[in-house]
């Protein structure tokens, strides 16, 4: 998916750390220009400086909380206003937490659904038509191995990742004839801040 995009623009969500930051490093090494978005401006600036030093990467930073309604469209509009054409979309932003459904804070659950599902879907909806019209583009939606089975104590998270996987597979079939590649990426256990946020950093030991 990422081998023929040199000198083109990629948008990476959740780019401040973990898998998103690694995607940014990998794409920069392949000669792509990057739009990096996340909530933490300091980490985005640090990453952009490092990529410029190592690869001379053209980088735009947009601070954005995609779990907030309206933010995916604001991000899309701000990028369009810069005259940037996104050829590769990495929908990586997301989080999870552990607990039974009756222990779950309702607002935190809604925040996770908005970020893991709604924002990913909206950004795909916004960018896919342009890619299809141009006959070229790629979308990588980061799911999880949790997509393949129900996970007790993470029921909403695992169900959400199943959505991401099935959504991606369906779009792969729809978009491939238009020159657009859609991939659902399902990482296994990866040492990132995810486990700290989920309150289960001991799982990595």
Predicted features and spans:
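Conserved glycine-rich Rossmann-like NAD(P)H-binding loop of the short-chain dehydrogenase/reductase
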Residues: 30-47
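Substrate-binding pocket helix/loop in short-chain dehydrogenase/reductase
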Residues: 100-101, 105-113
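Conserved glycine-rich cofactor-binding loop
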Residues: 9, 16-17
């Amino acid at each position: 998916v990422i081998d023929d995009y040199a000198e083109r623009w990629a948008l990476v969500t959740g780019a401040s750390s973990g898998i998103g930051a690694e995607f940014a490093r990998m794409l920069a090494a392949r000669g792509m220009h990057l739009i990096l978005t996340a909530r933490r401006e300091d980490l985005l600036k640090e990453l952009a400086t490092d990529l410029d030093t190592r690869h001379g990467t053209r980088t735009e930073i947009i601070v954005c909380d995609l779990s907030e309604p309206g933010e995916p469209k604001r991000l899309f509009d701000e990028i369009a206003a810069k005259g940037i054409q996104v050829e590769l979309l990495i929908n990586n932003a997301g989080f999870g937490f552990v607990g039974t459904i009756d222990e779950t804070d309702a607002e935190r659950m809604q925040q996770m659904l908005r970020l893991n599902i709604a924002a990913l879907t909206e950004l795909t909806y916004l960018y896919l038509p342009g890619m299809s019209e141009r006959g070229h583009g790629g979308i990588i939606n980061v799911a999880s191995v949790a997509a393949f089975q129900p996970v007790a104590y993470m029921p909403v998270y695992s169900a959400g990742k199943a959505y991401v996987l099935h959504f991606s597979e369906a779009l792969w079939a729809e978009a491939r004839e238009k020159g657009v590649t859609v991939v659902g990426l399902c990482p296994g256990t990866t040492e990132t801040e995810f486990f700290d946020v989920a309150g289960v950093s001991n799982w990595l030991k």
